[in-house]
């Protein structure tokens, strides 16, 4: 009866009957609900999930697609490709190695690769970032160029303005800026209790006899800082293992005295009165 009384289309354009409701722009959908019992007919899921979006959410989706790129339209073939693929192996290494620092693109020898044309179009994704291997500072096989002193420039001028002799320049340039430690035998003398002792595994600067850690007397426990350690060698044959024809008796309980041959000759305290023990710092 309503269709007969009220015409479906207005007589005058732009004018509608005040009592007739405006037809909705989209067909309202019922909320998805679970049937209370088996076999009950329930509403089916729509074939197109985009039909469930209202006008506001649909406008938000179009705005997001427009931000990703102008070539992204509203077609279905683009909706499946919208996403960022994350490689956990690459991204985790970058996060752990760099931390909060930002990536800087170097002009020469850069390890940062830009995205190829057509690859991840519109997403602004770059290719995986590659970093050089970190050089261990405490390794003997590390690159010495990281620890060397400033060298000459292209113009032939030095970075330092002071002038030195050629012999001093060679000595300074050949000297490593980083010093390694090695273990040596140490021979010490305490002036407080007038006791001499010998210690093994003393940390010294590599290539020198300079002691790196403070030593403690085994008798009075007084700590002193010896700057140098005597080299363990025979004073007559200048060898670590004495090759002299006349050798004194070697005590098997104290084998370190065998390397101190000739050390107590002419000294107030003989090697028999020294105390030998080992300790590791």
Curated annotation (Swiss-Prot):
Subcellular location: Cytoplasm, Cytoplasmic ribonucleoprotein granule
Tissue expr: Expressed in oocytes.
Renumbered zinc finger spans (3CxxC-type): 183-267
Family annotation (InterPro entries): Zar1, ZAR1/RTP1-5-like_Znf-3CxxC
One Pfam family in the UniProt entry: Zn_ribbon_3CxxC
GO biological process per UniProt: negative regulation of translation; oogenesis; translation
Keywords: Cytoplasm, Developmental protein, Differentiation, Metal-binding, Oogenesis, RNA-binding, Zinc, Zinc-finger
Broad class of where this protein is predominantly found: cytoplasm
Gene Ontology, cellular component aspect: cytoplasm; cytoplasmic ribonucleoprotein granule
Molecular function, one GO term: mRNA binding
The keyword Metal-binding is assigned to this record: yes
Described function: mRNA-binding protein required for maternal mRNA storage, translation and degradation during oocyte maturation. Controls timing of meiosis during oogenesis. Probably promotes formation of some phase-separated membraneless compartment that stores maternal mRNAs in oocytes: acts by undergoing liquid-liquid phase separation upon binding to maternal mRNAs. Binds to the 3'-UTR of maternal mRNAs, inhibiting their translation.
Family: Belongs to the ZAR1 family.
Self-association state and partner proteins as the record states: Component of a cytoplasmic ribonucleoprotein complex together with eif4enif1/4E-T and cpeb1.
Record remark on domains: Disordered regions undergo liquid-liquid phase separation (LLPS) for the formation of membraneless compartments that store maternal mRNAs in oocytes.
Protein name per Swiss-Prot or TrEMBL: Protein ZAR1-like 1.L
Species assigned in the record: Xenopus laevis
């Amino acid at each position: 009866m309503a269709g007969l009384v009220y015409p479906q289309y207005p007589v005058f354009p732009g004018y509608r009957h005040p009592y007739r409701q405006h037809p909705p722009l989209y067909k309202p959908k019922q909320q998805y609900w679970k049937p209370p019992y088996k076999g009950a007919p329930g509403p089916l899921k729509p074939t197109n999930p985009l039909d469930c979006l209202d006008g506001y959410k649909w406008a938000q989706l179009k705005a997001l697609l427009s931000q990703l790129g102008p070539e992204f339209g509203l077609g279905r073939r683009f909706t499946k490709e919208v996403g960022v693929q994350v490689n956990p192996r690459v991204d985790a290494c970058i996060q752990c190695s760099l931390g909060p620092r930002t990536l800087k693109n170097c002009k020469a020898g850069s390890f940062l690769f830009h995205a190829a044309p057509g690859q991840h179009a519109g997403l602004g994704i770059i290719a995986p970032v590659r970093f050089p291997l970190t050089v261990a500072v405490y390794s003997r096989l590390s690159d010495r160029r990281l620890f060397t002193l400033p060298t000459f420039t292209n113009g032939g001028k030095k970075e330092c303005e002071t002038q030195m002799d050629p012999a001093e320049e060679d000595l300074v340039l050949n000297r490593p800026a980083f010093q390694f430690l090695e273990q040596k035998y140490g021979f010490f003398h305490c002036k407080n209790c007038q006791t001499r002792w010998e210690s093994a595994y003393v940390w010294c600067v590599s290539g020198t006899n300079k002691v790196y850690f403070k030593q403690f007397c085994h008798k009075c426990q007084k700590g002193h800082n010896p700057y140098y350690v005597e080299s363990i060698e025979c004073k007559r044959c200048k060898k670590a293992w004495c090759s002299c024809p006349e050798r004194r008796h070697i005590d098997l309980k104290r084998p370190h005295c065998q390397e101190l041959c000739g050390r107590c000759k002419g000294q107030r305290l003989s090697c028999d009165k020294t105390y030998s023990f080992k300790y590791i710092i």
